[in-house]
Curated annotation (Swiss-Prot):
Enzyme class, UniProt record, top EC level: isomerase
Residues holding Ca(2+) 1: D511, N513, D515, E517, E522
Residue ranges of domain PPIase FKBP-type in the record: 63-151, 175-263, 287-375, 400-487
Gene: FKBP10
Residues making up the signal peptide according to the UniProt record: 1-27
GO biological process: aorta morphogenesis; collagen fibril organization; extracellular matrix assembly; in utero embryonic development; protein folding; wound healing
Protein name listed in UniProt: Peptidyl-prolyl cis-trans isomerase FKBP10
Posttranslational mods: Glycosylated and phosphorylated.
Keyword Cytoplasm: no
PANTHER family xref list: PEPTIDYL-PROLYL CIS-TRANS ISOMERASE FKBP10, PEPTIDYLPROLYL ISOMERASE
Skewed-composition ranges (Basic and acidic residues): 557-583
Glycosylation-annotated residues: N71, N183, N295
Length: 583
C-alpha cells in the first residue's frame, strides 16, 4: 500500500527540502483557482467540474481516505503519468501531506463518480525542481480525475431503509439465522456480487463471525420483507486485502438487501388467533383427526401451497407424526371454526434441506389455518336436546320402531348438505334396520314425538373416510332433528302381527268362498280387513302390497298359487317347530 512503501507515482510529495521550498509559496483559498493579475502565473489550482453526479451523499474532506483514477499531462497534452496504465487505483488519505498540495486541494469537496479537470501550477506541484527524467522544473500539471470511493476512519455502517412492511412480526438480533437477497456494489456502482444470479438466498447466522462486521451490524433490526441500503467502510468489510479480483483493497461496499426471513434456533412455534368462534366447548388434542383448510407462505409472503386450490381440506391425525412437528404442535388447542396463524421455524418444518422446489432450505413457514372440524375415533354421537314436550312424552323411540322425522344436515362450518324440508315430507326409517347412518339411528333413539335434538355425528358413525354424494370424506356431521311420529316396530323377521290372539280356525276365516283353498286375492282381502279393523298390523315403512305378497309366498309352500289348510302356519308356530327341531 502507498502508506507503507516509497512513492510509486508522481502525485506523492517530494523530499523534505523540496517540501519546505514549496511551502514558502503563499497558498490561496480553495476554489476554482484564479490567475495572477495581468495574465501572470496561476496562484491556485484551477478546478473544472465537468461531470457531477445527480446525488452526492458526501464530499471529500480533510483526513478522508479516497480511491481515484487519474491521467496526468503537461500543457501540450503529453502524458507523464496515469493510474489507468498501472491498472491500480490511487488509495490515499487527503490533506495530510501524502499528496502534492495541488492534488490535495483539487480533491476537496469531490463526490463519488464526479470527474474533474485540475490545473496545478508549479508551486503547488513539483516546483522549480521537478522530478528528474519525468517532470521538468516549473511545470504546470493537468490532471483528469474520477473519484471512486471516499471514507473516513471515524465512519460507521450507514443504513438506509428503502421499504419497511407495515407489519413486522420480529426484528433481526444477534445469533439469529437469516435468509436474504442482496446486490453488492462498490461505492461507484460497480457490481461485484449478487445472490439473485445464484438461484437462492444467502443464508447465514448474524453476529457469529460468519459475515463481515459491517453486514453483521447492518442486518440488525431488519424485518422480514424489509429492503435496506447498507454502506460499509472498508475497515468493517475486507480492508486492505480486498477480496479476490472483485473487491479492491480499501474499498467501501454498498449492499442493497431484501430480508426474506429470520429465525433463531431457539424459536418455538408462534400462534396467532385470527378468529375464534363463540362457544368453543372442545379443543383439539393429540390423537384427534382434523379437517382443515390452509394457505402456506414463506415469511416474505410467497405462497407455496394452499388446500383451497385443490378444493379439498387437508385431513390428518394431530400429534401423531403424520405432519411436520410445528404443524402438529400448532393445531393442538384449536377450536372448530377457528382461524389461526401458525409460524413455524425451519427446525420444526423442513430444516436445512427444504422440500420440493417451493420451500427452500432453512425457510420459516407461515400457515393461515381454518379448522373445519375434528373428532376422535373413540367419539360417540353427541346429543343435545333443544326442546322436549314433557307433558306428552310417555313413550320414546326404540330399536325396531318406525319413525317419521324432519332433519337439517350440515357440516360443522355451516355448509348446508341436506334437509327433509326440501322434499316436502318427513323422512321415515325403521330404527336399527341399517337404513340410515349409525349415528343418526342412535341419535333418534329415546326421542319423544315432538322432541327436537341436535346431533354431532363423527365420521366413523356417518359416511367414513370415503364420504358420500355431497359429503366430504371424514366429515363430522351436524343434524337438527324433530321426531314427527313413531310406530312400534315388529319383531325381527315378522311381516304382520296380531294385536290379540289370532282367530280360531284361521283357515276357515281366510277361505272366503269356502272352496278349501286360498288364492292370493282372498289372502290379500283377509289381511287388509284385519288391519282396517285394528286386529293386526303390517310391518311399518314397507309397501303393503309387497308385504302381503311376501306373506303369501311364505305360506304357499309348494308355490302352486294357493294356500291349503295344511300349508297355513303362523310364524310363531314355525319358530317353535324350529326350536324343537334344533333340540
Amino acid at each position: 500500500m502507498l502508506r507503507a512503501g516509497p512513492p510509486s507515482h508522481t502525485l506523492l510529495r517530494l523530499p523534505l527540502l523540496q517540501l519546505l521550498l514549496l511551502l514558502l509559496v503563499q497558498a490561496v483559498g480553495r476554489g476554482l483557482g484564479r490567475a495572477s493579475p495581468a495574465g501572470g502565473p496561476l496562484e491556485d489550482v484551477v478546478i473544472e467540474r465537468y461531470h457531477i453526479p445527480r446525488v452526492c451523499p458526501r464530499e471529500v474532506q480533510m483526513g478522508d481516505f479516497v480511491r481515484y483514477h487519474y491521467n496526468g499531462t503537461f500543457e501540450d497534452g503529453k502524458k507523464f503519468d496515469s493510474s489507468y496504465d498501472r491498472h491500480t487505483l490511487v488509495a490515499i488519505v487527503v490533506g495530510v501531506g501524502r499528496l502534492i498540495t495541488g492534488m490535495d486541494r483539487g480533491l476537496m469537496g469531490m463526490c463519488v463518480n464526479e470527474r474533474r479537470r485540475l490545473i496545478v501550477p508549479p508551486h503547488l506541484g513539483y516546483g522549480s525542481i521537478g522530478v528528474a527524467g519525468l517532470i521538468p522544473p516549473d511545470a504546470t500539471l493537468y490532471f483528469d480525475v474520477v473519484l471512486l470511493d471516499v471514507w473516513n476512519k471515524e465512519d460507521t455502517v450507514q443504513v438506509s431503509t428503502l421499504l419497511r412492511p407495515p407489519h413486522c412480526p420480529r426484528m433481526v438480533q444477534d445469533s439469529d439465522f437469516v435468509r436474504y437477497h442482496y446486490n453488492g456494489t462498490l461505492l461507484d456502482g460497480t457490481a461485484f456480487d449478487t445472490s439473485y444470479s445464484k438461484g437462492g438466498t444467502y443464508d447465514t447466522y448474524v453476529g457469529s463471525g460468519w459475515l463481515i462486521k459491517g453486514m453483521d451490524q447492518g442486518l440488525l433490526g431488519m424485518c422480514p420483507g424489509e429492503r435496506r441500503k447498507i454502506v460499509i467502510p472498508p475497515f468493517l468489510a475486507y480492508g486492505e486485502k480486498g477480496y479476490g479480483t472483485v473487491i479492491p483493497s480499501q474499498a467501501s461496499l454498498v449492499f442493497h438487501v431484501l430480508l426474506i426471513d429470520v429465525h433463531n434456533p431457539k424459536d418455538t412455534v408462534q400462534l396467532e388467533t385470527l378468529e375464534l368462534p363463540p362457544g368453543c366447548v372442545r379443543r383439539a388434542v393429540a390423537g384427534d383427526f382434523m379437517r382443515y383448510h390452509y394457505n402456506g407462505s414463506l415469511m416474505d409472503g410467497t405462497l407455496f401451497d394452499s388446500s383451497y386450490s385443490r378444493n379439498h381440506t387437508y385431513n390428518t391425525y394431530v400429534g401423531q407424526g403424520y405432519i411436520i412437528p410445528g404443524m402438529d404442535q400448532g393445531l393442538q388447542g384449536s377450536c372448530m371454526g377457528e382461524r389461526r396463524r401458525i409460524t413455524i421455524p425451519p427446525h420444526l418444518a423442513y430444516g436445512e434441506n427444504g422440500t420440493g422446489d417451493k420451500i427452500p432450505g432453512s425457510a420459516v413457514l407461515i400457515f393461515d389455518v381454518h379448522v373445519i372440524d375434528f373428532h376422535n375415533p373413540a367419539d360417540p354421537v353427541e346429543i343435545k336436546t333443544l326442546s322436549r314436550p314433557l307433558e306428552t312424552c310417555n313413550e320414546t323411540a326404540k330399536l325396531g320402531d318406525f319413525v317419521h322425522y324432519h332433519y337439517n344436515c350440515s357440516l360443522l362450518d355451516g355448509t348446508r348438505l341436506f334437509s327433509s324440508h326440501d322434499y316436502g315430507a318427513p323422512q321415515e326409517a325403521t330404527l336399527g334396520a341399517h337404513k340410515v347412518i349409525e349415528g343418526l339411528d342412535t341419535g333418534l333413539q329415546g326421542m319423544c314425538v315432538g322432541e327436537r335434538r341436535q346431533l354431532v355425528v363423527p365420521p366413523h358413525l356417518a359416511h367414513g373416510e370415503s364420504g358420500a354424494r355431497g359429503v366430504p370424506g371424514s366429515a363430522v356431521l351436524l343434524f337438527e332433528v324433530e321426531l314427527v311420529s313413531r310406530e312400534d316396530g315388529l319383531p325381527t323377521g315378522y311381516l304382520f302381527v296380531w294385536h290379540e290372539d289370532p282367530p280360531a280356525h284361521l283357515f276357515e276365516h281366510m277361505d272366503l268362498n269356502k272352496d278349501g283353498e286360498v288364492p292370493v286375492e282372498e289372502f290379500s282381502t283377509f289381511i287388509k280387513a284385519q288391519v282396517s279393523e285394528g286386529k293386526g298390523r303390517l310391518l311399518p315403512g314397507q309397501d303393503p302390497e309387497k308385504t302381503i305378497g311376501d306373506m303369501f309366498q311364505n305360506q304357499d309352500r309348494n308355490q302352486d298359487g294357493k294356500i291349503t289348510a295344511e300349508e297355513l302356519k303362523l310364524k310363531s308356530d314355525e319358530d317353535q317347530d324350529r326350536v324343537h327341531e334344533e333340540l
